Amino acid sequence: MLETEHANTEVHELCRQMIARIEKYGTLEGFSDSDILEVLKTIKEILEPLPCLIEIIAPVVVFGDIHGQLGDLLQFTNEVGRPPDFQYLFLGDYVDRGPNSLEVTVWLFCMKILFSKKVHLLRGNHEVRRVNTMYGFKEEMMRKRNSHLWKVFNDVFAELSICASINRKILCMHGGISPKIESWDSLTGMTKPRVHGDCEHGLIVDLIWSDPNRKDDTIQFNKMRGISTLFGKSVVDNLCTTLAIDLIIRAHEMKEKGHTFEFDNRLLTVFSAPYYSGHNSNLGSVATISKSLKLRIVTLKPNKGYDRSKLDKRTLHDFEKNFQPLDENPRKNISCQFNVPPNGQKMSPFLGEYSMFAHETQFCKKDNETPVKKPYSSNQDEDHSVLDMIRKTQKGYGVEVSLKDKVMSLESIRKKLGMTTSTTPPPPRTPSPDAPLAQSPPIPRSPPSSTENA
């Protein structure tokens, strides 16, 4: 018993060190393959006994696709708060596309080890060996580590749960729902798809791969994916009635605003990778659900005004060396912010919060101050030239913040839908292009990769 406790203490300390290194430098350099294997061994032991359907009690923050975009992941956690004070549910697709799939996954695993009751991880379609062989994770692992570690990561992915319920009122998964779900027993009776082929048939393939059918209400083969099905509004309505739930939350698709409500607000798609693949102008969102099941969206807005191709190698090198970590004890902050990324990548200023109906918003005013130009310096203690150059690229970006008393609960939404089921909520207001940006610490960002769906 003492040996086990001592071993756990050592692993926990290793996880803390890895998290600190990842958040400060965006890398795992300095840690051996054996260190990573120790984390993988521990997380596998934690995940193995978990069922396919995990039960969660609100409050919780729900994350969509991450896709190796480490900086955006850290910025989200910096804004919404961190465990043990806050609970997380991740809907999958941690790897591929972005450059930091390794660091994102290790960060998530370490957080799960340290806060096993507060961090919940689901499996996405990119946590399938065949998929992450083709879309970047294997290549990244071969470049940073070795193929053996890539195989072990996929063994751990096979132990991830498939779906989650929040207070038995909200059902969450990566892909979508299935007409094969007849009751809660259909979900609790699933077996984890530990063999690759098990991910490609039955109920599980739909939970990982399916998409909404926005053209008509029929169930069709998902031609775009080449696998699984498309489900319509009637399937959503029937499932909500059958399971007595109010909302379904899924990920799997890039959304321009970072999220979308569909089918009388019973289906929410959330996508947490802003400026996806570096070529899109999409926002990224997470959903926060309070203890009373009040729903709020937190969104990151990408910045088009900064391109790594405009920086010379000397400036990039100094910028990387001067990278600073996020706050160790972040607090929720909905004020105007601006995040300077390392490596000259696209910037993601924090857009703010608003309720699902975005009833009222307030905007910051445009900052007309002209920054003072300072000479280039390679001194690690002075990064003025880089920051000045970035400030010159700014044109002013909107920061939208909700009024907190405008957030609606799921119960009030249900009552409203019961009165006027044909009424749809007004779309969120377009953020002002003339808002100012306040300075905040830099964070890592992902480079261009692909514009395909998650």
From Swiss-Prot:
Q: Name one GO cellular component term.
A: cytoplasm
| InterPro entries in the record | Calcineurin-like_PHP_ApaH, Metallo-depent_PP-like, PP1_catalytic_subunit, Ser/Thr-sp_prot-phosphatase
- Into which family does the record put it? Belongs to the PPP phosphatase family. PP-1 subfamily.
Q: Where is this region: Disordered?
A: 414-454
Cofactor detail note: Binds 2 manganese ions per subunit.
- Segments of skewed composition (Pro residues): 424-447
- Any idea which UniProt keywords this protein has? Hydrolase, Manganese, Metal-binding, Protein phosphatase
What EC number is given for this enzyme?
A: 3.1.3.16
- This one is known as Putative serine/threonine-protein phosphatase C27B7.6
- Reported cofactor(s): Mn(2+)
- In this chain, Mn(2+) 2 is annotated as bound at D93, N125, H174, H252
Catalytic EC class: hydrolase
Query: Where does the chain bind Mn(2+) 1?
Result: D65, H67, D93
Q: Which residues form the active site?
A: H126
Q: Does the keyword Hydrolase apply?
A: yes
Top-rank taxon, per record: Eukaryota
Catalysed reactions, as listed in the record: O-phospho-L-seryl-[protein] + H2O = L-seryl-[protein] + phosphate; O-phospho-L-threonyl-[protein] + H2O = L-threonyl-[protein] + phosphate
Gene Ontology MF terms in the entry: metal ion binding; protein serine/threonine phosphatase activity
